[in-house]
């Protein structure tokens, strides 16, 4: 209950990724997804003072990130996360562990896509050809598992 009143929250637990969060640090971050032809985030949470935003994508089926999880879906999700981060021009150093709380009044919150995504739907917007075993995944986000 305390987390609901916090300005920042941890959107995912230790064993599953329900939300993929990107940190976009420029004044037009809220609509940056549209400018580059990326899928609409489910939610944007924007800093009213500078326009920087967290773009949040919800997954209809969470990705298991625990050590006993299946490597193939995890690698696929990591490739999607890396390609989408690149397309959005999002902060490469942001791990997604903590994000702006969409329920906190400090932020400007907008809902763009009410339906949760599956990985195939997200991949429709991305070129994943460089991640088909030839390109190393980043050592952060889903790629570090």
Predicted regions and their residues:
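Structural alpha-beta junctions
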Residues: 38-44, 81-94
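Poly-acidic low-complexity segments
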Residues: 2-4, 32, 91-94, 118
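A structural signal for short, well-ordered beta-strand segments and their strand-loop junctions
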Residues: 45, 54-56, 93-99
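Long, charge-rich alpha-helical interaction segments
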Residues: 105-145
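Signature for HUH/AEP ssDNA processing cores
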Residues: 1-53, 59-75
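Short secondary-structure subsegments characteristic of cysteine-rich extracellular domains
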Residues: 68-88
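Short, surface-exposed recognition loops or helix-turn segments adjacent to catalytic cores
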Residues: 89-109
């Amino acid at each position: 209950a305390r987390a609901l009143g916090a300005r920042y929250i941890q959107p995912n637990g230790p064993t599953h990724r329900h939300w993929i969060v990107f940190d976009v640090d420029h004044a037009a971050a809220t609509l940056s997804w549209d400018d580059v032809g990326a899928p609409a985030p489910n939610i944007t949470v924007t800093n009213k003072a500078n326009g920087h935003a967290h773009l949040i994508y919800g997954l209809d089926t969470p990705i298991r990130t625990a050590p006993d999880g299946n490597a193939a879906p995890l690698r696929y999700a990591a490739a999607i996360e890396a390609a989408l981060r690149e397309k959005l021009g999002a902060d490469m150093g942001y791990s997604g562990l903590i994000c702006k709380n969409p329920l906190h009044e400090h932020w400007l919150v907008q809902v763009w896509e009410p339906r949760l995504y599956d990985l195939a739907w997200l991949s429709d917007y991305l070129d994943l050809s460089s991640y088909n075993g030839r390109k190393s995944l980043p050592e952060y986000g889903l790629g570090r598992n």
